[in-house]
Amino acid sequence: MATEHLPAERAQSPLSAPQRVEEPQKPNYALRLTLAGHSAAISSVKFSPNGEWLASSAADALIIIWGAYDGKCKKTLYGHSLEISDVAWSSDSSRLVSASDDKTLKLWDVRSGKCLKTLKGHSDFVFCCDFNPPSNLIVSGSFDESVKIWEVKTGKCLKTLSAHSDPISAVHFHCNGSLIVSGSYDGLCRIWDAASGQCLRTLADEGNPPVSFVKFSPNGKYILTATLDSTLKLWDYSRGRCLKTYTGHKNEKYCIFASFSVTGRKWVVSGSEDNMVYIWNLQTKEIVQRLQGHTDVVISAACHPTENIIASAALENDKTIKIWSSDY
């Protein structure tokens, strides 16, 4: 146990209250597990909302379900004919949706590993997907430049939004389900009313670099965007203002997933094209840790819902998932 040495004149008497130990200003993420199972570049990793599982998708057209704590392969989901770009969990952790270059989305029952429905309607690669919080709707984004909203129960497309003028890179539902955010290679980030399909706001940067990732913050007040000029930004979208900018990583080519870490202190986490995971202090914007170990571009970084655990995944010269954990 570390002892704090105080100058003599400030030493506490035995009767005074003990000093509060300050939480460390930086995390100490260390590698715990390396998961190998995919035979091609991994595209996405996501923890289940209940924290038990990790789903990964890859260019081998497979989804693998892993134990989040033991790293064991629990299930492999077969069905897509071409590479998968994204996967997302339902709120009760019982179902998954996947987005594929075969122009379809598939809805899966996790326990049985069976495909429940195939959602057809996009005319080009489906690149990104998400469930709304009640998990009765799915949103998808495609290289056909549209965003589609699907009904889970029937598998029908309820709405098609002519969202952007270039491929859609990311879609995400707000925590109350009322809004959808989309990002595109056209350099725009758009916020949509999920019920009406109306565009409520457009966020754009000077120079309009391609938007490679977007996500609402867990409290729903902010949006995190990534652009292909190696920049992450935190937006107060209700005012259309950029509040924070995070730099130091490399992101010029790939749509790399980023995440908010809120289980300990508040960090922003992202993969990088220099084969590392970057962690920033959300408030101060300083890089607090870089995680080394992958041997190719880290395409995806996901944070566990309740523990200080990060999963990262890399492209074809690596093909592994790494699980990292921190004491705080």
UniProtKB/Swiss-Prot annotation:
WD repeats: 37-76, 79-120, 122-162, 163-202, 206-247, 250-290, 293-328
Xref: InterPro entries: G-protein_beta_WD-40_rep, WD40/YVTN_repeat-like_dom_sf, WD40_repeat_CS, WD40_repeat_dom_sf, WD40_rpt
Molecular function terms, GO-annotated: histone binding
Signal peptide segment: none
UniProt-annotated stretches for the region Disordered: 1-23
Coiled coil: none
Motif (DDB1-binding motif) on chain: 186-190
PROSITE patterns: WD_REPEATS_1, WD_REPEATS_2, WD_REPEATS_REGION
Highest taxon of source: Eukaryota
Keyword Repeat tagged: yes
Keywords: Repeat, Ubl conjugation pathway, WD repeat
Any one GO cellular component localisation term in the record: Set1C/COMPASS complex
Transmembrane found in the keyword field: no
Function: May function as a substrate receptor for CUL4-DDB1 ubiquitin E3 ligase complex.
Entry similarity comment: Belongs to the WD repeat WDR5/wds family.
Subunit structure and binding partners: Probable part of a cullin-RING E3 protein ligase complex containing CUL4B-DDB1 and a substrate-recruiting component (DCAF). Interacts with CUL4B and DDB1.
Annotated protein name in UniProt: WD repeat-containing protein 5B
Gene from which the chain derives: Wdr5b
